[in-house]
Amino acid sequence: MVYIKQLGAIKDSAIEISPVMLFSGESGLGKSYLAMLCHYFFYILQDAKRINRYIESKGWNFSEMRNSFRDTGVAITISKQDFEDWLAADCISYLQWMLNNEGLKGELSIRLPNDIDEDIVVRYEEEILGLVDKEDVYIKLYMLDLTYRIKDGSIESESPFAFLFRHGLIQNILGDFKNLEDTFVFPPSRGPMLTEEIIPKTGLYDRYKKTIHKIGRVNPHPETVSENLRRLLSKILEGKVDTKDGEYLYSTEHGELPISAAAASVREIAPLALLVERTNISKVAMLIEEPEAHLHPIKQRMMADILSCFINAGTYMQITTHSDYFLRRLNELMDLKKLSQRYIENTEKYVDICNKLQINSALSVEYNKISAYLLSRRNDGTTQVTKQDIDKGVPFASFSQAIDDSLCVGFNIKKYLTDGTI
C-alpha cells in the first residue's frame, strides 16, 4: 500500500499495488507519475544496485562481517519500518530521475505486505564440503524463506544480503522468486527512438532506449508466445516487425522496408511485438503509457485485445490511457470473462455466444488482476485519486463529458446555420 501525502499535484490519496494498474482521467493530473511510481516497485526488485545501496547505507559489508561468522547465528536484522521509509525516499529520487525534475516534491508512506515480519532476520550457517584437506567453505544465508549459498573468496558486485533480500521480497510479494525476470518501459512517442539517434534527457527515455536495445538483440523465444497474441499483433501491424544487422524492418505480403518508412502506428507498436517474440512475458513488468497513441479507433480496440493477452499471460503492467475506445473494449472483455464464468459448466454455449458476437472467446480478460484508478481535479486544483469498482467496469466519465460537449456545440452551430437561432 502506498499513501500519497503529495506527489506533484496529487495529494492525500492511496493506491494498492496490483498485478495490473490502470490510470485514466484528464491530462495534467499525474497519471504518468502514478504509473512510474507503481512500476518502481517492480524495477527495484530487479535492479541489482538500488537495494544494494540500502544495505551499504546500513554499513552491512558481507566480506568484512564474514570473518566473524562462526557455526550458526544472526548476520543482520532489517527493520521493516526502516526499509519502508527508505523506499519512500528512494521512490521520490527515482521519479525525479525518470522525469529529469529534481524539483519534484513528494511525500509518501509505504507499507509492505502484512505477512512480512517487522524484523527481517538474516541468519547464517557455515558449511564445509569436499574431501579432507581439500575442503570448500561456504556460508549459507537464510531470509524470507529462501537460502543462498556463498563460497568463501567469491566476489560479487551485489552484496549477498541485497541479492537474497531482493529475491525474498519477490517470493513473498509475487509468490515465487522466479516470477520476475525483467522490467521494461514504453513511454509516449515511442516510435522515433527506433529510427533516430536521440540522446535522452529523462530517465524514462533512457530506460526505454535500453529496453529497445535489449529486446532488439536477444534471440526470439517462439515457444513462449501464444498463437492468439501473435495473430493479434500481425493483424494490428498488418505485417511483421523484425531486426537485421541492428536495423528494424517491417515486412508485409508486398515486401520489406525500413521501419522508418512504415506508418507511425507501426513504429509505436513494433517494440511490443518484439517484446512478445523475445521475452517470456509472463515474467516481466511493463510500464506502457498511452497504448492507443497514433492508432485509428478500430486499432485502439485491437490494442485492448492485445493487452488483455498480456494480462492473461501474467504480465505485470502499469497503463495510462486517454482513450474511451480502449477502455470500452477493455470493459467488454471483462464482461466477457463474467459471461464465461456464467457458462463454466456449458463451454459450448459460451463459445456459441462468442461466435454470434464475432469475438474470440479466448480474449476474456482476468479482471480480478486489474486495479483501476480515476484521477480528478479538486476545487483547490490538487488531484484526487479514486479507486474504481472494477466489477462495474472502468469508468470514462471525462470522455463522456467531452462527447456530450462536442455533440451539444455541433448541434447548436448547425441550428444557427439553418435558422439563425440557438
Cite the ranges covered by each PLM segment.
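Conserved ABC ATPase signature
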Residues: 25-28, 32-33, 242-301
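Walker A/P-loop NTP-binding motif
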Residues: 38-45, 275-278, 306-309
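Extended hydrophobic secondary-structure segments that form protein cores and membrane-embedded regions
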Residues: 185-186, 364-376
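ABC-family P-loop ATPase nucleotide-binding domains
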Residues: 205-208, 212-246, 251
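Helical segment within the ABC ATPase nucleotide-binding domain
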Residues: 300-312
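Conserved H-loop
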Residues: 316-325
